[in-house]
Amino acid sequence: MEFVFYACSLIAVISTLLVIIQKNAVYSLLYLIISLLSISGIFFIFGAFFAGALEVVIYAGAIIVLFVFVIMMLNLGKKNDLQEKKYLNPIFWIGPSFLSLILFLLMTYAIFFVKDKQIYFSLIDVKEVGINLFGPYLLLVELSSLLLLSALVVVFHIGKEKK
């Protein structure tokens, strides 16, 4: 299990560095998704399954979608469209794909072949997730929802065209 931990940590560090280095915002978001998924893998390794699942759902899901909306609202014009055609070249998407493949293989190895700390699946329903979130963490959930709402309002205000 140590090998999986170090591999997930290495992928998290590499992809986070690529988030900082990358000049295009969309590819930076791809590397950010890989970084967040590898961090959730580390949560799963340490046995914090709920925190790992929340990492995937909240950060890699909702917040990344919000970032994509910001990029879409910027609307960089025809120059950006020509540059996006250039980005269809495999050299631009091979890096995120390779890191995602390594992360997928590591998680598959950890789930099926590591016997001493194997991840066991258990189904929980939405009611249990709601009770766990809105029980002791009600204030944190409400504050984070207000933060996301205010970020959405700011993005809308910045992205709105002036007439």
Swiss-Prot record:
InterPro entries: NADH_UbQ/plastoQ_OxRdtase_su6 (IPR001457), Nuo/plastoQ_OxRdtase_6_NuoJ (IPR042106). It is a multi-pass membrane protein. The chain crosses the membrane at residues 1-21, 30-50, 54-74, 94-114, 138-158. The keyword Membrane applies. Its EC number is 7.1.1.-. One of its GO terms (cellular component) is plasma membrane. It is found in: Cell membrane. The keyword NAD applies. It comes from the Bacteria. One of its GO terms (molecular function) is NADH dehydrogenase (ubiquinone) activity. NDH-1 shuttles electrons from NADH, via FMN and iron-sulfur (Fe-S) centers, to quinones in the respiratory chain. Couples the redox reaction to proton translocation (for every two electrons transferred, four hydrogen ions are translocated across the cytoplasmic membrane), and thus conserves the redox energy in a proton gradient. Composed of 13 different subunits. Subunits NuoA, H, J, K, L, M, N constitute the membrane sector of the complex. This is NADH-quinone oxidoreductase subunit J. The lineage of its organism: Bacteria, Pseudomonadati, Pseudomonadota, Gammaproteobacteria, Enterobacterales.
